[in-house]
């Protein structure tokens, strides 16, 4: 489906962008464009891959003109650019709005103007019942995506999205932090032992985006069914795997804007979601404001549903957590006694 096509990845120097490159650079894709702000990361990536299919565009999703220029001649877009650190977005909420909301508006408008065939927007479980600025901005991003998809010709451009949880060992995530603390002999800093999070590998994240790309219609949102684990289970598993089962753990309390558990689908979304095996598809609500022509009687299904969250999904024990961790190249390197860097 990518033969001879051009793909642009916004925020492409991050963990997701690197995972996509590893998957696609050796295929028959014509070109992959990396669009991001950081020229140093782009230069590092250029040297690392040294591939003529890889093109680099310096720019910011906040700047419509730079997005418009970069997307000219592109067939597909994976929109991954985002501010995603919860505490920093709490202190700078308008920066989250500028990147996650207005930046998405710019990417989608540029895609429509340039006749891009398909766009997949990457969202997060924090957009469901959001209590923090990052989650609120991502929830608004999803609303922008659905609103844009209502008014676009599906024969020209398809806009859909994905929503996923914690991507294990990605840059800025907790697993590399715990590994560093174990190596340095520092107590593991746990916010709340009972806090649960969905667990996904980077490969899972790429698979989810490709599934949405292949199956999505305008306004669709896709979610992968994923296991979850408590932060304590993750910490205990890591200390055991690194030969330090008695390593101390320090409970430091939740950070700004953190939740005890995350949800991937709200109760309302579960009522209309389509079960597609390993994934859920959430279709857009395409009603207009004249509700009387759509609904004559109240919908009882919603009151019977339960949201899909990290407390009620499959719960990993330490053995299950270990099996999942060993899928990561980051942890495989550690097990071999080699230097490991976060998943890229």
PLM regions: where:
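N-terminal Rossmann NAD(P)H-binding glycine-rich loop of SDR-like oxidoreductase domains
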Residues: 6-27
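Rossmann-fold scaffold of SDR-type NAD(P)-dependent oxidoreductases
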Residues: 10, 71-80, 121
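Conserved glycine-rich Rossmann-like NAD(P)H-binding loop of the short-chain dehydrogenase/reductase
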Residues: 28-41
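Conserved residues in the N-terminal Rossmann fold of short-chain dehydrogenase/reductase
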Residues: 36, 58, 98, 192, ...
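Conserved Rossmann-fold cofactor-binding substructure of NAD(P)-dependent oxidoreductases
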Residues: 55-76
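Hydrophobic/aromatic anchor residues within beta-strands of the central parallel beta-sheet
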Residues: 56, 96, 159-162
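Conserved Rossmann-fold NAD(P)-dependent oxidoreductase catalytic core, especially the SDR/UDP-sugar
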Residues: 79, 83-139, 143, 147
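Strand-loop microenvironment adjacent to phosphate/nucleotide-handling motifs in alpha/beta enzyme folds
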Residues: 107, 113, 143, 147-344
């Amino acid at each position: 489906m990518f033969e001879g096509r051009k793909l642009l990845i916004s925020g492409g120097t991050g963990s997701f962008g690197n995972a996509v490159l590893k998957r696609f650079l050796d295929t028959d894709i014509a070109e992959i464009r990396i669009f991001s702000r950081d020229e140093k990361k782009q230069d590092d990536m250029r040297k690392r891959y040294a591939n003529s299919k890889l093109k680099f565009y310096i720019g910011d999703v906040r700047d419509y003109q730079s997005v418009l220029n970069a997307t000219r001649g592109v067939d597909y877009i994976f929109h991954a650019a985002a501010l995603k650190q919860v505490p920093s977005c709490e202190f700078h909420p308008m920066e989250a709005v500028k990147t996650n909301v207005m930046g998405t508006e710019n990417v989608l408008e540029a895609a429509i103007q340039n006749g891009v065939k398909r766009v997949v927007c990457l969202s997060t479980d924090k957009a469901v019942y959001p209590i923090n600025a990052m989650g609120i901005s991502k929830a608004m991003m999803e609303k922008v995506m659905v609103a844009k998809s209502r008014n676009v010709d599906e024969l020209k451009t398809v806009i859909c999205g994905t929503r996923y949880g914690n991507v294990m060992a990605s840059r800025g995530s907790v697993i590399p932090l715990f590994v560093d603390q174990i190596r340095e002999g520092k107590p593991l800093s746990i916010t709340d032992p009972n806090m649960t999070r969905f667990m996904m590998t980077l490969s899972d994240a790429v698979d989810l985006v490709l599934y949405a790309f292949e199956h999505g219609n305008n306004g669709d949102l896709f979610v992968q069914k994923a296991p979850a684990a408590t932060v304590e289970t993750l910490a205990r598993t890591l200390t055991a795997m690194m030969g330090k089962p008695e390593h101390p753990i320090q409970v430091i309390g939740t950070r700004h804007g953190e939740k005890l558990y995350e949800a991937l689908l709200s109760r309302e979304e579960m009522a209309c979601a389509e079960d597609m095996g390993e994934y859920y598809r959430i279709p857009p609500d395409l009603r207009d404001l004249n509700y009387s022509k759509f609904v004559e009687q109240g919908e009882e299904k919603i009151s019977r549903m339960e949201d899909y969250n990290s407390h009620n999904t499959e719960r990993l024990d330490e053995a299950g957590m270990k099996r999942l961790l060993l899928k990561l190249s980051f942890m495989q390197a550690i097990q071999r006694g080699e230097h490991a860097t976060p998943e890229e």
